[in-house]
Amino acid sequence: MDLGTTKYIIYTELIADGYVEKHDVIGAIFGQTEGLLSNELDLRDLQKSGRIGRIDVDLENINGKSFAKITLPSSLDKVETSILAATLETIDRVGPCFATVKITEVEDIRVSKRQYITNRARSILRKLMDEMIDTYEITEEIKESLRTEEIMEYGPENLPCGPNVVHSDSIIVVEGRADVLNLLRCGIKNTVAVEGTSVPKSIMELTKKKTTTAFTDGDRGGELILKELLQTCDIDYVARAPYGKEVEGTSKKEIMKCLRSKVPVEQIVGNTCNDACNVSKVIEDTPKEIFEPVTHKYYEKVETPVIEPVFEGPVVEEEIVVVEPVKKTETEIIDVDATNEIQADRKFSGVKEIVDSIKNTGNVKFVVDGTEKTNTFKEFLTNIHEIKKMDFFAADMPISQKIVDLLYDKTPIIVGKEINVTKKPVNLRLFSFDEIVA
């Protein structure tokens, strides 16, 4: 059915009590409506002028009855179409048979067309929006191409690196090329990749010259690379991607957070690679202010203690040298012989027993108001803000400058596996395990 300029379609059902044919139905429509209305609404004249379309009849004969579905296109207005539809229901005979006619629907073709237009326009717009590249995407695409061009190669192994690796005072060591590219997207240009678990010699040499941060994935592979780096390179800081994530898939916000929370190697629990691999958890559970450097006005340089040979016989204590200030200030007393400090601290009740109890455990033990407490170093750091004063602190780990800065105003005595500090307050006494058990 060619709709052309059709505005409405009249759908009609006809039931005849006997057997009739299609031309009988068409004849009844024209014959029984003729003269009912004015000449302006005569079906023959309307059809000749093209204001109504071709009448379509779909007829079936079942059990001696005839059932027909009639469609009549109309380009008349709404009122005239309604009058024409009502006129069709006046048909009561088709050929020799009685018949009934009922209008089932008058469809507004323009509504259907509007719905089609709406749906099609939505589809076209969606396609256009999918294909359209906005200004932001164009900018990012250009930046991405420039960043890709910024990737350089370092050393005889042609390792992927950022453009500032050679000239920067500090570098970030990552796993692969994709990690370098992701950090370039974040504006970080002093990165270099090891390209595998076997650390190249050029990386080993580079870490000796520059402040180095190892930034590895938050998975098992990242742990293996971190172990290798700690064993072969001079690493100063360690940062880990969020647990289960890779550096190349980490967002800019997460990368910046990880790098800001990097942990000095000395702060990692113990002195083993397995402990180092838990640094991401240490970072999450440790308050930021713990890692801030502390400057104290009463610092003195720590000189290497000279241990005099011990001879049999009565112990003769060395004379304590008192440095008198020019002005009237507090007297600063500096022990000349570290052996005397060891002997003095042996008077502290149970020091040797405390040291023996935490050896090879990685734990710390401290005394608060005469009560001994044992924790892991991570638990101790978490609860450090609750501790005001300690009588004594011992840790099964090297004592670094960071630990001294953290505890100098909380305890007068610190004992550790090793003492690796450059300066200490004069009122703080530091001893290694070997000095305690000697």
Swiss-Prot record:
KW Nucleotidyltransferase (keyword) present: yes
SUPFAM superfamilies linked to this entry: DNA primase core
Reaction catalysis annotation: ssDNA + n NTP = ssDNA/pppN(pN)n-1 hybrid + (n-1) diphosphate
Subunit note: Forms a ternary complex with MCM helicase and DNA.
Enzyme Commission numbers on file: 2.7.7.101
Domain of life the protein comes from: Archaea
UniProt record, GO biological process: DNA replication, synthesis of primer
Residues in coiled coil: none
Residues where Mg(2+) 1 binds: 175, 217
Keyword check for DNA repair: no
Chain ranges of the Toprim domain: 169-243
Keywords, comma-separated and alphabetical: DNA replication, DNA-directed RNA polymerase, Magnesium, Metal-binding, Nucleotidyltransferase, Primosome, Transcription, Transferase
Naturally occurring in which organism (per UniProt): Methanococcus maripaludis (strain C5 / ATCC BAA-1333)
Family: Belongs to the archaeal DnaG primase family.
HAMAP family from the UniProt entry: DNA_primase_DnaG_arc
Cofactor annotation remark: Binds two Mg(2+) per subunit.
Cofactor: Mg(2+)
Binding site for Mg(2+) 2: 217, 219
Gene: dnaG
Enzyme class: transferase
GO cellular component: cytoplasm; DNA-directed RNA polymerase complex; exosome (RNase complex); primosome complex
Pfam family, one: Toprim_4
SMART domains per the UniProt record, alphabetical: TOPRIM
Protein name: DNA primase DnaG
InterPro entries registered for this protein in UniProt: DnaG_primase (IPR050219), Primase_DnaG_arc (IPR020607), TOPRIM_DnaG/twinkle (IPR034154), TOPRIM_dom (IPR006171)
